[in-house]
C-alpha cells in the first residue's frame, strides 16, 4: 500500500503465480503415452495352396452362397478358418460378376475382328488393295475381268488380221459358213440429189489391202466374188450432171468403178448447145 499524508491508496501489484499446475493428460489424469493409443488391427493375407483352390472352386461351381455348415466342412478339410472361407467366397463372387460384365465387350471385339477379316478378304477378291498394305500394290484382277466381259458383251473381240483362204474340199463348208456369217447384204440408199451410197461388205481377206486393180467387167465380177475387207466401204457414185464434161472415174478411191469412165451417165443436159435453157 502507498500511504500519503491524508489517505492511503491500495497497491495494484499482484502476487506471483506460485500454485502448481498439473500437466496436460489425455486419459484420466495419466501422462500422455503413445503406447496407450489403440492399434488398428492389420489384415493378414492368406495364401492358398493349389489343392485348397481346387476344393474351393469345386464348391463355388456347386453354389456361390454356401451355408455355414458347408463352409465349416470345407474349412476342416483344407485346415483354414471358416471366416477365411467366407471372405474367399465373397471375393470370388465379385470376380465372377466382373467377368460377366466383360463378356459382351469381348464378344463385340471378336465379332469386329471377324468382320474386319471378312472385309479384307472381300477387298482382295474385288481387286482393292489391303488396308495397311503398300500403296503401290494395285491388283488388276477386277479390271481385266471387266474388260473381258465388256468385250464379249459388245462383240468387239479382236479378230486375226490374216486368215488364209482354204480351197480344199474338206474345209469348203466351214469357209462358206464363216463367209456367210460375216457377209452383209448391200444396202443402197439415195442421199440427196444425184448421190447414190452403196455399202458393201464381205468376209475378211488377207489380201484385201494388196488387191490388184481389175480393168474389165469380168475382173470386177471375179473380184466381187472374192472376200474383201470386213469394214463397210462407202462408195459415192456421183452421176455426170454435165455429160459433155466427162468425169474421170479412174480417180475414185475404188478402182473397180473405172468402167464408168467409158460409159458416162446418160443425163439430160440443162441447156442446148446454142445457149438456150430448157
UniProtKB/Swiss-Prot annotation:
What SMART domains does this protein map onto?
A: HOX
Q: Does the keyword DNA-binding apply?
A: yes
Q: Which GO terms describe its cellular component?
A: chromosome, telomeric region; nucleus
UniProt note on tissues of expression: Broadly expressed during early embryonic development. During later embryonic stages, expression is detected in AWB olfactory sensory neurons but is absent from there by early L1 larval stages. Expression in non-neuronal cells including the excretory cell and intestine is maintained through adult stages.
Record feature DNA-binding region, as residue ranges: 41-100
Q: Which Gene3D superfamilies match?
A: Homeodomain-like
Question: What Pfam families does the database record attribute to this sequence?
Answer: Homeodomain
Residue ranges for the region (Disordered) are 98-182, 200-228
Ranges in coiled-coil conformation: none
**Which PROSITE patterns does the UniProt record give?**
HOMEOBOX_1 (PS00027), HOMEOBOX_2 (PS50071)
- Show the ranges annotated as biased composition (Basic and acidic residues): 98-118
InterPro entries hit by this protein? HD, Homeobox_CS, Homeodomain-like_sf
CDD domains recorded: homeodomain
Q: Where is the composition biased (Low complexity)?
A: 168-180, 205-228
Q: Where in the cell is it found?
A: Nucleus; Chromosome, Telomere
Keywords of this entry? Chromosome, Developmental protein, DNA-binding, Homeobox, Nucleus, Telomere
Q: Which GO terms describe its molecular function?
A: DNA binding, bending; DNA-binding transcription factor activity, RNA polymerase II-specific; double-stranded telomeric DNA binding; RNA polymerase II cis-regulatory region sequence-specific DNA binding; telomeric DNA binding
Disulfide bond is among the record's keywords: no
Domain text:
The N-terminal and homeobox regions are together sufficient to bind telomeric DNA.
Main role? Answer: Binds to the telomeric DNA sequence 5'-TTAGGC-3', requiring at least 1.5 repeats for binding. Bends telomeric DNA and may provide chromosome stability. Also required for development of AWB olfactory neurons.
Q: Which family does it belong to?
A: Belongs to the paired homeobox family.
Protein name stated in the entry: Homeobox protein ceh-37
**Organism (species):** Caenorhabditis elegans
Q: By which gene is this protein encoded?
A: ceh-37
